Amino acid sequence: MPSLLLIEDDDAIRTALELSLTRQGHRVATAASGEDGLKLLREQRPDLIVLDVMLPGIDGFEVCRRIRRTDQLPIILLTARNDDIDVVVGLESGADDYVVKPVQGRVLDARIRAVLRRGERESTDSASFGSLVIDRSAMTVTKNGEDLQLTPTELRLLLELSRRPGQALSRQQLLRLVWEHDYLGDSRLVDACVQRLRAKVEDVPSSPTLIRTVRGVGYRLDPPQ
């Protein structure tokens, strides 16, 4: 049974989502503020965090940043509007996905399960790209022999690119493969995740040699020369 931490200040929304997600088979702990949510996170280890953007005191963006300093738990943001700035800031803060309110419990449940599947083990082979080694059995990535701390979404994106070295994948292809949804052209999810992934796997993230941008298409993972 997946365990969730729901951080939402609106009592009605928090209660409704807690009830719906519990009925869907999740164990749900709740907090009404960012401070309380961070305290709960120190006391228990959820499988995933559902985090409202507009919180009293510490907002959802800052909560997300603080979590990402020490933890790679998957995070889904709840935002009241499909605002470009809110979405971009949220994704750059380290969120794996976002859902626009109002949201039905079963829709959020589908997103949660899709995010959790990204960390599931798959094939038993490994792949090497220079100093970068991807172990698909252990679901680990090392660079120069040191473990990299990737979120489930970052790991899944790297796995999908590594299956097709040298092949360009469009943003829409990556949305389907990694996020399991067509977001009506919302390539910001892909671009933000690539940016975070490059910061961890590239020697010089501003001049990437592994994860290359294919102009007008998307991205590819290049084997080292």
UniProtKB/Swiss-Prot annotation:
Its main location: cytoplasm. GO terms for cellular component: cytosol; nucleoid; protein-DNA complex. Phosphorylated by AfsQ2. It comes from the Bacteria. GO terms for biological process: regulation of DNA-templated transcription. One of its GO terms (molecular function) is phosphorelay response regulator activity. PROSITE patterns: OMPR_PHOB, RESPONSE_REGULATORY. Residues 124-223 bind DNA. It is found in: Cytoplasm; Cytoplasm, Nucleoid. Keywords: Cytoplasm, DNA-binding, Phosphoprotein, Transcription, Transcription regulation, Two-component regulatory system. Residues 3-116 form the Response regulatory domain. The modification 4-aspartylphosphate is found at residue 52. Forms part of a two-component regulatory system AfsQ1/AfsQ2 involved in secondary metabolism. This is Transcriptional regulatory protein AfsQ1. It comes from Streptomyces coelicolor (strain ATCC BAA-471 / A3(2) / M145).
